[in-house]
Amino acid sequence: MAKKKKNKSKKTNKKEKVEYIKEESSFIGYYIIIAVIIFIIFGLIYGLRVLNPLYEDWALTKSDLMQHYSGWKAFRNESWHFPIGLLNSVSYPTYISIIYTDSIPLLAVFFKLIWFLLPKTFQYFGLYGLTCYILQGIFSAKILKKYTDSKINVIVGSLIFTLIPSMMFRMFYHTALASQWLILLSLETIYLYNDYKDSNKIY
């Protein structure tokens, strides 16, 4: 009896996973539409030139963005220190962390690892900004489609999430704080956990 119940549970869980994959696959086209619309909106707001890694003039403003970019430049041209992320060329002899320049530390460390492949002038803040916008739209769509079957409503709702003032104003002033898609990713993870937390149980 227990074995029969176990097999039935496995079949149910497998069916749920298959249905989830099918649902996500059917929505891929809409994710692409959302990404394209957001790309256009991003270009209208900030211009497409900021996406050029070789174009740095826009980052050399009086805003905090200059601090972010200067932190990356200093970190890139400095020797490695431990813990990873330390630099002292901007406050010698004191060491500070790249975290405090808000230079998107994960990207700063990654690009420093491949510094020899990069041109002399290189900025990643524009591309990161676009990535934040697109991920904001996609993760909000993934959450919204749990509450409505209307794909139009999902698309419109995701655009509203993307155009919230806190997102737009923070993007190139406190760029790290524009990573609001991480909040949506956290919510989506909670939803997935609640939906599939029993999928590996044997009873």
What would you call each of these model-derived segments?
Residues 16, 26-27, 85, 104-108, ...:
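Coil-to-alpha-helix initiation sites in intrinsically disordered, low-complexity, charged segments
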Residues 39-136, 164-179:
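Membrane-interface coil-to-helix junctions
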Residues 33, 50, 89, 150-152, ...:
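Short hydrophobic/aromatic segments of transmembrane alpha-helices and their interfaces
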Residues 23-24, 28, 59-67, 202:
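Transmembrane signal-anchor hairpin modules in multi-pass inner-membrane enzymes, especially those
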Residues 22-26, 30, 116-121, 125, ...:
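Juxtamembrane/transmembrane-helix boundary motifs in multi-pass membrane proteins
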Residues 128-130, 134-143, 147, 152-203:
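Membrane-embedded helix bundles of polyisoprenyl
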Residues 32-36, 109, 127, 155-159:
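Hydrophobic alpha-helical transmembrane segments
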